[in-house]
């Protein structure tokens, strides 16, 4: 199109003048109607909250829409992107939630001002993003607001302390101080005092001057502001409450984070005030209290299925995840998360009675009797069996019913819970792929996560890990195998824990992106504590079908930080858990931090040294090459790099390291000093300084397809003497890809693997690689020292407070490290010795047989230990004191026997005796005995051991020519020979 320039730009054409006049008249006519209406109908707070310029911008947008005859649907964005204003026709139910839903997710919502016209024809919602402008002590207006508020509090809120109120106001923003009234700031402070440093929300309800409206204020710590505002608006909509005005404000709560205040001026849909005595308020209040901890799937579910209440929606979502874990081994595709959930949603006629069965059974006010529960279950079983249009639906509901029947405890009725948790009958999840029956299983479901805790003994311990998939596809994959991973890790831990009183356990939660780690860890732990704390108020809300007290001991694993550890211990104490100090190991101060002391790696190093010696390499005298997965910033891998240099110096040649960030490779060996720098700084291998490489070395980041391929294949590609998996996902080497570990000539790329990381190899892969000539030290042997260290820490935590522990910590830790190295040495020697005697049996199989032999023997010994304490006190005491680090025994004395739980002491003795005998006499020592004979033989063994010590001392003190030789033979074989004596 060609534009023709007018010869006289200052004189508009008659056509232009006519159009301008017409438009001006239309705008003027519209303005004459809209402006007075606007000034009369917008609430007073709108004009207080909104600058004159912003008011004019809003009016111009409204006029443009009105003049054109279109509905008002305008979104205004400030030039800097820090402010968005949504102007909409009509204050219909849910309009605020819909507007908030469409706000950008990548910006932090710092404030919101929601206003609707008095006649309900218009809403103007303004949202501010980015960091708040903090209080400025040089700003006179802000200082005046603080002083005015403090003066106001003296008259109207005399219970508020001026200094605390001032600190609160200083932690607010400039906008907060200059826009809120003294009354509102005082009311906020009253709420702030109640939740500061906590994770529980609080809700207040106040009357407004308008007799038809009320003010609902929600105060919540460390919440996502955008999410909180949207959820609150949706819950109000579900309960037929209309929002006429709303505000969102944030105040700092150092050192705990921040507190968000979401305030609504609202009324019921029938234009009546919301009153606390109104029966409609209690369910609304209850659901608001759940908002911070509620999964988004629940909010979406009740939005599309209004026939379900919020509590029912939560149960459907939770049981869908549990049912999926039950059915995944059958058909992972048919029983995906979405298909299980949609089946439950779409068949409410079956779902609702199952939910009613669950809630009735565990309602603490009137729990369903067992007979009635069984009768209803049978009726539902018949209904489910009659489903004829879908085999999958029948399977899903059958599993759903079995899951409900397997629940022994639940926190569903506990007030202020962070998550939904159940203690399950462990038989629920046992099957062909999970043959061993755990002792106990917990399932926890919450906002953005679900997780399990599995243990194989009454007293058990194991780490808590957080799995953080990067996207939805990876989340689905990790979620699908979650229980199998926890089950496998717990069973591996059971094998690993053969030297300590605790059995094997593991906990893991998988986060759905973009779920926040801290919140999910807190929700999971709180859900477990709900079910095990004896605190009376909590117990009164739990119907118990288990019938016994339970103790859980956790430790840190992937993505658990020192901050989490401190919070977990403090929260356990706040929840009145009796062994709070022992609830979590590796406490930064009152514990033994695994990474700081390298406890796991110390054991891995002992196994590596003895295995290298068995292959003709003395690492203290000869150069050897090693590749490692896991970065210098990791616990096991990083400490291995440090210890290899400490113990072997230049002999230890680390030719390759791979972690999540990339790879570092150098055939001359990666520079030890540079690796040490990365370890101390907590940096990944991608930060390795290329200047420290040889001419053939390289560092490649995993930010390209080539880098990812190099990272994922390093453990297969590099040819060296030993491979130490010190990090990486379970089943990295599996039955499908184990051949990639072999060289073209069929020989393994490293003839020795020492598994510092758990489950890096699958059982089938281990067997195949062993047959191909690889000597493999299995994870349950190689990295057992980490859990052993935690066990010693737990013992000290049950006997000492933090102050007492810190006084003995240096000596105590040194003695623990001695015990760890000795335990690793004993096992390495017997394993390799058994391997020489049974060359056709793969070493991983011997490792498992060793663990099973010790555990089975301990299981047979434990029931008899109670009588030992009474009738063989000297032996009982000797075994307990031999297990404990000397400094702990010296410090607490007889309190060891008075204060440690009886069951714990019995397992100290049972495991201590079993491991002592099997390490000395061999895997098959107890194999041919009846279980009833094991305890008797073990006791006689200990008695003969005491006798032999006396004989050895006697021989050593004699003047016999071969006294030393005789004493050595007695020590080596005297006990077993003495056992063959016939007692007379």
Write out the residue ranges for each language-model feature.
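Regulatory modules associated with amino-acid/nitrogen control
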Residues: 1-251, 266-294, 329-333, 343-353, ...
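Short glycine-enriched nucleophile-adjacent loop
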Residues: 641-645
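Ligand/cofactor-recognition surfaces for anionic moieties
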Residues: 118-125, 129-131, 153-169, 200-222, ...
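Short terminal or interdomain "cap/linker" segment that borders an active site or interface and mediates
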Residues: 637-638
């Amino acid at each position: 199109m060609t534009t023709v320039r007018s010869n006289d730009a200052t004189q508009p054409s008659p056509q232009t003048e006519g159009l301008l006049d017409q438009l001006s008249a239309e705008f003027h006519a519209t303005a004459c109607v809209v402006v007075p209406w606007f000034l009369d109908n917008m609430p007073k707070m709108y004009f207080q909250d909104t600058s004159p310029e912003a008011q004019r911008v809003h009016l111009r947008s409204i006029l443009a829409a009105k003049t054109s005859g279109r509905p008002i649907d305008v979104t205004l964005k400030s030039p800097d992107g820090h402010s968005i204003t949504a102007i909409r026709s009509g204050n219909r139910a849910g309009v605020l939630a819909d507007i908030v839903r469409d706000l950008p997710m990548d910006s932090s919502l710092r404030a919101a001002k929601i206003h609707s016209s008095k006649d309900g024809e218009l809403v103007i919602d303004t949202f501010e993003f980015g960091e708040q402008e903090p209080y400025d002590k040089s700003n006179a207006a802000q200082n005046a607001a603080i002083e005015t508020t403090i003066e106001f509090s003296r008259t109207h809120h005399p219970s508020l302390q001026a200094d605390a109120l001032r600190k609160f106001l200083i932690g607010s923003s400039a906008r907060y101080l200059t826009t809120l009234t003294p009354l509102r700031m005082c009311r906020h402070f009253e709420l702030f005092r109640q939740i500061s440093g906590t994770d529980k929300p609080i809700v207040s309800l106040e009357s407004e001057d308008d007799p038809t409206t009320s003010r609902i204020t929600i105060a919540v710590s460390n919440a996502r502001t955008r999410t909180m505002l949207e959820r609150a608006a949706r819950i109000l909509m579900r309960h037929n409450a209309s929002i006429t005005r709303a505000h969102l404000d944030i105040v700092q709560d150092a050192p705990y984070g921040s507190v968000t205040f979401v305030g609504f001026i609202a009324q019921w849909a029938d234009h009546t005030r919301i009153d606390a005595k109104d029966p409609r308020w209690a369910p609304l209040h209850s659901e608001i209290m759940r908002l911070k901890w509620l999964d988004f799937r629940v909010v979406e579910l009740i939005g599309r299925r209004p026939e379900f209440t919020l509590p029912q929606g939560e149960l459907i979502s939770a049981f869908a995840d549990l049912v999926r874990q039950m059915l995944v081994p059958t058909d992972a595709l048919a029983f995906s998360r979405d298909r299980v959930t949609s089946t439950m949603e779409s068949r409410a006629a079956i779902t609702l009675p199952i939910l009613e069965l669950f809630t009735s059974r565990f309602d603490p006010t009137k729990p369903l009797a067992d007979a009635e529960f069984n009768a209803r279950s049978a009726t539902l079983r018949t209904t489910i069996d009659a489903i004829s249009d879908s085999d999958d639906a029948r399977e899903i509901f059958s599993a759903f019913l079995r899951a409900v029947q397997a629940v022994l405890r639940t926190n569903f009725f506990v007030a202020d819970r962070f998550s939904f948790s159940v203690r399950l009958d462990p038989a629920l999840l046992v099957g062909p792929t999970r043959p061993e029956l755990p002792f106990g299983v917990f399932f926890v479901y919450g906002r953005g996560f679900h997780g399990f805790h599995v243990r194989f003994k009454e007293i058990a311990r194991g780490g808590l890990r957080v799995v953080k998939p990067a996207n939805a596809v990876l989340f689905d994959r990790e979620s699908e195998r979650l229980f199998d991973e926890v089950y496998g890790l717990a069973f591996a831990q059971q094998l690993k824990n053969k030297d300590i009183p605790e059995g094997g356990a593991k906990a893991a939660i998988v986060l759905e992106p973009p779920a926040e780690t801290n919140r999910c860890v807190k929700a999971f732990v709180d859900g477990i504590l709900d079910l095990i704390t004896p605190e009376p108020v909590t117990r009164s809300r739990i119907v118990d079908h288990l019938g016994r007290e339970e103790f859980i001991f956790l430790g840190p694993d992937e993505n658990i930080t020192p901050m989490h550890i401190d919070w977990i211990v403090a929260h356990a104490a706040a929840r009145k858990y009796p062994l709070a100090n022992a609830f979590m190991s590796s406490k930064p101060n009152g514990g033994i931090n695994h990474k700081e002391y390298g406890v796991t790696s110390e054991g891995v190093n002992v196994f590596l040294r003895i295995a290298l010696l068995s292959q003709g390499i003395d690492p203290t005298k000869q150069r050897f090459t090693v590749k490692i997965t896991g970065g210098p910033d990791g616990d096991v891998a990083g400490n291995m790099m440090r210890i290899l240099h400490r113990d072997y110096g230049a002999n230890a040649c680390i030719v390759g390291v791979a972690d999540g960030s990339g790879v570092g490779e150098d055939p001359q060996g990666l520079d030890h000093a540079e690796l040490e720098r990365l370890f101390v700084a907590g940096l990944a291998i991608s930060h390795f300084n290329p200047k420290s490489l040889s001419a053939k070395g390289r560092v490649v980041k995993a930010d390209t397809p080539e880098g990812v391929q190099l990272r994922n294949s390093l453990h297969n590609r590099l040819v060296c003497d030993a491979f130490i998996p010190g990090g990486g996902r379970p089943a990295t080497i599996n039955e499908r890809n184990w051949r990639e570990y072999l060289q073209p000539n069929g020989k393994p790329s490293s003839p020795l693997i020492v598994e510092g990381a758990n489950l890096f190899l699958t059982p089938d892969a281990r067997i195949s690689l062993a047959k191909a000539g690889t000597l493999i030290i299995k994870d349950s042997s190689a990295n057992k020292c980490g859990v052993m260290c935690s066990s010693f820490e737990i013992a000290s935590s049950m006997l000492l407070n933090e102050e007492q522990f810190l006084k003995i910590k240096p000596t105590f830790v040194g003695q623990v490290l001695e015990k760890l190295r000795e335990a690793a040495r004993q096992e390495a020697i017997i394993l390799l010795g058994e391997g020489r005697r049974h060359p056709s049996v793969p070493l991983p199989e011997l490792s498992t047989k060793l663990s099973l032999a010790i555990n089975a023997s301990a299981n047979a010994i434990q029931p008899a230990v109670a009588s030992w304490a009474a009738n063989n006190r000297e032996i009982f005491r000797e075994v307990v004191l031999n297990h404990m680090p000397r400094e702990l025994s010296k410090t607490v004395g007889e309190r060891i026997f008075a204060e440690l739980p009886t069951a714990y002491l019995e397992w100290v003795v049972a495991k201590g005796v079993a491991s002592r005998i099997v390490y000395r006499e061999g895997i098959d020592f107890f194999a041919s005995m009846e279980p009833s004979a094991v305890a008797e033989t073990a006791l006689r063994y200990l008695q003969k051991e005491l006798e032999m010590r006396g004989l050895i001392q006697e021989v050593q003190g004699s003047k016999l020519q071969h006294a030393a030789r005789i004493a050595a033979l007695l020590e080596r074989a005297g006990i077993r020979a003495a056992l063959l004596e016939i007692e007379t």
